[in-house]
Amino acid sequence: MGRGKIEIKRIENKTSRQVTFCKRRNGLLKKAYELAILCDAEIALIVFSSRGRLYEFSNVNSTRSTIERYKKASASTSGSAPVIDVNSHQYFQQEAAKMRHQIQTLQNANRHLIGESIGNMTAKELKSLENRLEKGISRIRSKKHELLFSEIEYMQKREADLQNENMFLRAKVAEAERAEHDDQQAAEDDEMAPAPAVGGGSSSGTELEALPATFDTREYYQPAPPVSMLAAAAAAAAAQYSSDHHQTALHLGYFKVDSGKGGLL
């Protein structure tokens, strides 16, 4: 079974790149040696590794002599330089043509994606385009739904945070209102309470202080009765007391002692 085709591009792995360089360098030197022997050609080969190390091969005295011969040939031959320039110009023209073709292909593909320039497409190409569009739309919808779900989840979390913050603020406001109401009620109670008596005193003094400011003692003032009226009142009171005392003694059954005898009156 033959060896598979290797894609020519830079080897990313450093170790693999170094191993490949050593193998292919030896192969290149071998090919140069064989070419010099088989064709009797003067060959000078110069190679610099990625680390800057120099490798050279020459089938003559030295590589420097071959380089000097090259310089002399370039200076004496006027047609050699234009040949190199023509080759370079042709190379860049080919590369530019490739780039233009790639740009045209990409532009056509973009037009096909929006439904333009599809008149010359075959049924197979249209079916392939349809499949690609469906896959693209499916991926776009999936990504859109993912973003929407993420946004909804974020908004729900934000809503919960705002509700918690609102409840906290309501509790703070209610607490402040209760404290203000309690302070106001305490102030009203202090205003309604009577002032204490200064230096102590009887209850009558406190009651007099509690009387309204409009109290007028002149309304309760009455002149003293004359002396004769006082004497008559005192005599009546004494007579009444004597009568009451005599009746009480009769009802209680007092014993009266007479000539050394006792008996119930």
From Swiss-Prot:
One of its GO terms (molecular function) is DNA-binding transcription factor activity, RNA polymerase II-specific. Residues 1-61 form the MADS-box domain. Keywords: DNA-binding, Nucleus, Transcription, Transcription regulation. GO terms for cellular component: nucleus. Residues 175-184 have a biased composition (Basic and acidic residues). Expressed in developing seeds. SUPFAM superfamilies: SRF-like. InterPro entries: MADS-box/MEF2_TF (IPR050142), MEF2-like_N (IPR033896), TF_Kbox (IPR002487), TF_MADSbox (IPR002100), TF_MADSbox_sf (IPR036879). Residues 89-179 form the K-box domain. Pfam families: K-box, SRF-TF. It is found in: Nucleus. Residues 175-208 are annotated as: Disordered. The keyword Transcription regulation applies. GO terms for biological process: positive regulation of transcription by RNA polymerase II; regulation of transcription by RNA polymerase II. Probable transcription factor. This is MADS-box transcription factor 21. It comes from Oryza sativa subsp. japonica.
